[in-house]
Amino acid sequence: MDIREDISGLMSKCIGCGQCVDVCTSRKYGGCNPLEVMQGNLEAARGCVGCGLCNTVCNFTVPKKVMMYAVNRINNMDVPDVYHETGYNLPTSTLTDVPEPRYVKDAMSQLMPGCIVNASAPFLEYATERVLDLLGVSTERYEGGCCTYPVPFRGLDDRQRDAIKKETSKGLNGRKLYTICPGCAVEMRDAGIDAEHVYQIIRKNLDVLRGLPGINLTVAIQTGCTLRSDVRCFTKIVEACGCKVVETEQGCCGKLIPGISEKVMADRQASMKGVDAVVVGCPSCFARYDQYPEGIPVLYLTELILLAMGDDRTMRFHRRAVSRLSS
């Protein structure tokens, strides 16, 4: 189905209840209005952070899909040249001396770095491969690049994006795909690929984590928007590593949306005062927290487990160091 026809159909199913506005992260800070977008005003999508909360309250249509299309159109976005050159939506990181994952050729599964990790945090690939190895899962690197979730791809219809995913994933040959980004897992599953975020296998191996040397930190958890309903599972994982978890409201990191993200992050930071670090399950959240001036130090989930294993090799790449690292 043509993308414009698809979006028009989704808009026509909106009943105008306004619940999407009530839960919208951006709207609270003077940003987008999803109801106006659903009623045809694409310009009202300005300020959308892509949190997807609109989808969680709507039983009639798919407002997030419409919002992403609207953001794509009002910003005249096309698939970037860097994607055609590298397979990724963002330029590859220039960090040096990053520890190398110990991939196994023709392994039982593959690990997908995703665009954010490839661009700004390649050390998370090392941390995640090492944790999977700890759990008895050997991996080979997924070389298919981007999952086509990002907004620049939202001018394409589902058929076109699925075709890209199926073509770029041929190297899987039916094997399991683990992702570092939760959005990648959802996108790849939508194309019929056996994919899951790495936390899914971690949560099934808590006894392995409890047997590690451990790490004594007081932390908050921000799972990221896609995994917001899984905070209890994250808590069990973090506690199994030896940490104390301070409960805090789950929320979007705000990404890098001008005029919105600064306000969103200020609230996130204020809600977590006093912790040693915030543990996240999303690379986009990781990048946002790590870049926030004078903010709370951040650990990606597999980095925390890596620390519990006694390996701190990813810490030197952080902008904000975790000041209290004791085992």
Task: Please report, for each region that a protein language model flagged, where it lies by residue.
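The feature marks the first
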Residues: 22-25
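Cofactor-cradling patches in redox/metallo enzymes
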Residues: 116-122, 126-200, 229-327
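Iron-sulfur-cluster electron-transfer modules
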Residues: 4, 8-11, 27-193, 202-207, ...
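Selected transmembrane alpha-helices and immediately adjacent juxtamembrane segments
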Residues: 111, 219, 225-229
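Conserved AdoMet/S-adenosylmethionine-binding subsite of the radical SAM
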Residues: 211-221, 233-240
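Cysteine-cluster motifs in flexible loop/terminal segments that predominantly coordinate metals
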Residues: 14-20, 48-54, 256
